[in-house]
């Protein structure tokens, strides 16, 4: 009796979904407390003034204001939220 060995399965076909990382609020945009500014793996961007960092390195706004990015001499980029000047009443 002639036999043929069973064919092996393909070794490709494992591709993970995108994780939707990146900047969610760009420089100059107005944010409110709790708004996510950036989702990242590790600290591509560091938290500056009025910005918090979650356990997964997500940066979020602590106050209402305008998002700014500052590049420091040590090569790090800091994200801050500066309060919007209130209109005189």
Curated annotation (Swiss-Prot):
Keyword Ribonucleoprotein: yes
Keywords of the record: Ribonucleoprotein, Ribosomal protein
Protein name: Large ribosomal subunit protein bL27
Family designation: Belongs to the bacterial ribosomal protein bL27 family.
GO BP: any one term: translation
MF term (GO), any: structural constituent of ribosome
Gene3D superfamilies reported in the protein's UniProt record: 2.40.50.100
HAMAP family recorded: Ribosomal_bL27
Region (Disordered): 1-21
UniProt cross-references to PROSITE patterns, sorted A to Z: RIBOSOMAL_L27
Pfam families assigned to the protein according to its UniProt record, in alphabetical order: Ribosomal_L27
Any one of the GO CC terms: cytosolic large ribosomal subunit
Organism this protein belongs to: Bradyrhizobium diazoefficiens (strain JCM 10833 / BCRC 13528 / IAM 13628 / NBRC 14792 / USDA 110)
